[in-house]
Curated annotation (Swiss-Prot):
Gene that encodes it: LF1
Stretches with biased composition (Basic residues): 144-155
Gene3D superfamilies in the record: Protein LEAFY
Lineage: Eukaryota, Viridiplantae, Streptophyta, Embryophyta, Tracheophyta
Domain of life: Eukaryota
Free-text function comment from the UniProt entry: Probable transcription factor.
Keywords: Activator, Developmental protein, DNA-binding, Nucleus, Transcription, Transcription regulation
GO MF assignments: DNA binding
Protein name, as recorded: Leafy/floricaula homolog FL1
Interaction with DNA, annotated site positions: 226, 233, 237, 284
Compartment(s) of residence: Nucleus
Length: 359
């Protein structure tokens, strides 16, 4: 293909990224990598700060792309500038629209006011000829009322705009609360496309947490402080200060049992991922399905003592056992003990009856 034609095709498939990053020192190859991941300029503009960090970390860790420090800041700066430009353009359009409506409203009120002035002037001249009231006085009063109505109209428009902004903010906040973590079910080695990340990336976050824990332990030893042995709030705060704001306590605690299955039985974990991917299940259903294999492993290896299994594993010993997983193991232990007790009772009862029989 001709180089110029190739460049034209490249521009068409960039999704507006080259224009977005043009003045911010982002390499063309970096922009093309981001486009290969399925992102466009509009997609990036709609993403939150944490999601942008996730995207850049996926680019670095999963795609093994050497993302420069300046490019990280340049991407965010370009997005902020474009958002600001779009917002200013919307404000200008809104201002012109409001001004036109206010002008038309004022003209309509002015026409009505003039008619009322003529009517009042005629009545004053007929009914109050000697009272000293003049048409000029009536005109001044009407002008005052007209100004008052105009001010009231402008105030009402501003109030309506403020209420709409507040409702929009409430809707955005509600969407943020309802929004689940940005993961989709992927097979091992599969790279997720779009705004959501795959499960390989999720498991990689747990390895990153382990690295942050080691750094916190090293700093604590240098300062003579108590070293944490598990991933605690101190580790999450350290990760946030280090720039890894995409690592947070709710997200990591939510999927820790899925990571445990990945560590204890990678073959079973991969089979489960493949099955749910083929059926088109979402990540919430896959997360729930990860409990049962773990309970089975706990019953087979340690008599349902899931804490012992976590503590004996080098990658799991730094994580707290989820309460639900512990409760499930306890329930299975109890039901198994009850079943064994019932079986023992039913087996021993006929023997006792046989001994009572006379010979």
């Amino acid at each position: 293909m001709d180089p110029e034609a190739f460049a034209v095709v490249g521009l068409r498939t960039m999704g507006g990224l080259e224009e977005l990053f043009e003045a911010y020192g982002i390499r063309y190859l970096t922009a093309s990598r981001i486009a290969e991941m399925g992102f466009t300029a509009n997609t990036l503009l709609d993403m939150k700060e944490e999601e942008l960090d996730d995207m850049m970390n996926s680019l670095s860790h999963i795609f093994r792309w050497d993302l420069l420090v300046g490019e990280r800041y340049g991407i965010k700066a370009a997005i902020r500038a474009e958002r600001r430009r779009l917002l200013e353009a919307d404000d200008r359009r809104h201002h012109l629209h409001s001004t036109d409506h206010a002008l038309l409203d004022a003209l309509s009120h002015q026409g009505l006011s003039e008619e009322q002035v003529v009517q009042h002037s005629e009545k004053d001249q007929l009914g109050r000829a000697g009272s000293g009231d003049t048409a000029g006085t009536s005109w001044g009063a009407q002008q005052q009322r007209k100004k008052h109505r105009h001010r009231h109209h402008i105030t009402a428009m501003k109030g309506a705009a403020t209420e709409e902004d507040e409702e929009d903010e409430e809707e955005v906040e509600e969407m943020r609360r309802q929004r689940e973590h940005p993961f989709i079910v992927t097979e091992p080695g599969e790279v997720a496309r779009g705004k959501k990340n795959g499960l390989d990336y999720l498991f990689h976050l747990y390895d990153q947490c382990r690295d942050f824990l080691l750094q916190v332990q090293s700093l604590a030893k240098e300062r003579g402080e108590k070293c944490p042995t598990k991933v605690t709030n101190q580790v999450f705060r350290y990760a946030k200060k280090a720039g890894a704001s995409y690592i947070n306590k709710p997200k990591m605690r939510h999927y820790v049992h899925c990571y445990a299955l990945h560590c204890l039985d990678e073959h079973a974990s991969n089979a489960l991922r493949k099955s749910f991917k083929e059926r088109g299940e979402n990540v919430g259903a896959w997360r729930q399905a990860c409990y049962h294999p773990l309970v089975t492993i706990a019953g087979r290896r340690a008599g349902w003592d899931i804490d012992a299994i976590f503590n004996a594993h080098p990658r799991l010993c730094i994580w707290y056992v989820p309460t639900k997983l512990r409760q499930l193991c306890h329930a299975h232990r109890h039901s198994s003990a009850s079943a064994a007790s019932s079986a023992s009772t039913s087996t021993s009862a006929p023997t006792a009856h046989h001994l009572e029989l006379p010979y």
